Amino acid sequence: MTTPFTVIIPARYASHRFPGKPLASLLGWPMIHHVCRRAEESGAARILVATDHREIAHACREEGREVVMTRHDHPSGTDRLAEVAERLGLDDDQIVVNLQGDEPLMPGRLVRQVALDLAAHRDAGIATLATLCHSLDEVRSPHAVKVVRDRQGYALYFSRAPIPWDRDGFSGAAGAARSPGQWLRHLGLYAYRVGFLRRYPALEAAPPEGLEALEQLRALWHGVRIHVGLAHQVPGPGVDTPQDLAQVERLLAEQGPPA
């Protein structure tokens, strides 16, 4: 039997690097519309946009999207999801996927994959995905979050540093570092059980969370198991700054305009 799941798309207006980002035009449509189309391709039972801004809400409602207005002071997208889950009265065992509002190239099949991965691992509170790194520059980049898993695929740690550290390769003692395929790059796509989302806002922040600026470390620090699956495909890039729009628009044009 197919596991039903809900996709919630947090869409914040006041991005530091790109204010109003969800409304940025891509192929004549607001970016948030493209993200909603990716969610629809996943086969989700329900799709909601969670936003703190009336213009974003208006743009979504014009296209018939379900919108939940949230507080503007949430420190993270996970906190925003927690508010939505609480307000909608979702059951603790329901699965919610957090699809970021700046990921118009995230394939719907990956959204579905992460939801089904969580459903298959009952002892996990969270599921997420990773891909193999493709270059040593990617391994070393602090913008590419790396993850180390145990033998069953559960996360041991996430870091902006190149983990695991190649002692010989990176020190130069044994020549060039190993193939970049030895490292896993984390994708910022999560599935949560609603029971965990309800607990999250009350959890004490973890010391490494602030150092790394990675909110998933809070869950690990509190003993929540995070299952990390290998993504069935490599997604296109997200939109962090206005400079990213041209590349993303070109890639979207190759896929065809949204319906």
Swiss-Prot record:
It catalyses: 3-deoxy-alpha-D-manno-oct-2-ulosonate + CTP = CMP-3-deoxy-beta-D-manno-octulosonate + diphosphate. One of its GO terms (cellular component) is cytosol. Keywords: Cytoplasm, Lipopolysaccharide biosynthesis, Nucleotidyltransferase, Transferase. GO terms for molecular function: 3-deoxy-manno-octulosonate cytidylyltransferase activity. It comes from the Bacteria. InterPro entries: Cytidylyl_trans (IPR003329), KdsB (IPR004528), Nucleotide-diphossugar_trans (IPR029044). Pfam families: CTP_transf_3 (PF02348). Its EC number is 2.7.7.38. Disulfide bonds: none annotated. It is found in: Cytoplasm. Pathway: Nucleotide-sugar biosynthesis; CMP-3-deoxy-D-manno-octulosonate biosynthesis; CMP-3-deoxy-D-manno-octulosonate from 3-deoxy-D-manno-octulosonate and CTP: step 1/1; Bacterial outer membrane biogenesis; lipopolysaccharide biosynthesis. Its main location: cytoplasm. GO terms for biological process: CMP-keto-3-deoxy-D-manno-octulosonic acid biosynthetic process; lipopolysaccharide biosynthetic process. Belongs to the KdsB family. Activates KDO (a required 8-carbon sugar) for incorporation into bacterial lipopolysaccharide in Gram-negative bacteria. This is 3-deoxy-manno-octulosonate cytidylyltransferase. It comes from Alkalilimnicola ehrlichii (strain ATCC BAA-1101 / DSM 17681 / MLHE-1).
